[in-house]
Each structure stands twice: as C-alpha cells, then as structure tokens.
Amino acid sequence: MTNGLRKIELLAPAKNLECGIAAIDHGADAVYIGAAQFGARQTAGNSTEDIAELTRYAHQFGAAVYVTVNTIVYEKELHVLEHLLRQLVEMGVDAILVQDMAVLEIYKKLKAEYMTSGYRMPALHASTQTDNRSADKVKWLKENGFERVVLARELSLEEIANIHKAHPDVELEAFVHGALC
C-alpha cells in the first residue's frame, strides 16, 4: 500500500493449469480457476490435483489462487460440495468465489471444524453472479464473512466509488475487460 491506496491486483482467468502457470509467469498477482464441478465455466473441468499443483506453483512466486464455486448448488449436491471445499481448504487455495449461499453455510461449518487444525481457511469472495450493486448488499456480505465483493459489471465508476465510500474496508473487484471471464 502506498499513500493509503491499495495495490491494484492483476487477476487473470486460468481455464486450466497451463494457462494459470503462464499467467503467473507473465506477472499475474493471482489467478482464478474452476474445478470440475460448481464452476460457471462448464468447460473448465480442472481436477483437484491440477488446482493443487497450480496453488503450489503460485505460492512459490507469491501469487494467489482463487477457485470459482459460482454456480447454483442443488440439495442433492451438498455432500459433493462439502467434499470439494474440504479439498480446497487442505490444498491451501487463497480464496473461494461464491454465488450460492449454501457454500457459505458449509464454509462456516468447515471453519469451525478446521479452527484448531493448522489449516488456513481461504478467503470468501462474493462472485459477480450474486448481483452486487449496492452498499447495503456489500454490508450484508461483509457481515457474513466475505472479504471481497466482485461488483456487478453494469455499475458506473460513480456507483463503485459510492460503494467504496460506504465500505472502505471491503475489497472491491471490478471487471475491466468486458463481460466474459
């Protein structure tokens, strides 16, 4: 941080392990990647082994790995989701991007379980799919444990500034390259 300003993070999409490594090699501060399930990129299909390898690689260079768990989760999938979240915690990913609040509930349960285990819980990032358009929504997300909020893509710079003024302690993320990830 310089002069009270936060450093801008260069966050790159990684459709697979190779793209993630290339992004880090070319200066990305962080990458986001989807697993085989629960990611909005249906074609991602990355194994947990690939995500673990990317996480190890990224951490060698001080970069972060965020995993997208940003689809609607159905009741019958909750046990699979919990298993995935456990794997992500244990491999040391830096954050989980969330759409469905069922992920939040399982995360809270795991946080209580892992509290004394030596594992660090990944940060929670609210995906743009949670339709983050207002200071009130950002407040609610913060109160529920989210450290970063990915704002709706349609917001103006003025609207983003107003949200930041209302919640300067919450990390805000905005897409700057268009509507596609």
Q: What is each residue range found by the language model?
A:
Residues 14-18, 37, 69-73, 102-103, ...:
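Active-site-proximal loop/turn and secondary-structure-junction residues that shape catalytic pockets
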Residues 23, 100, 141, 163, ...:
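Conserved, mostly hydrophobic/aromatic
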Residues 9-13, 31-33, 65-69, 94-98, ...:
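Hydrophobic faces of well-ordered beta-strands that scaffold small-molecule active sites
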Residues 62-63, 119-120, 136, 159-181:
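Conserved anion-binding
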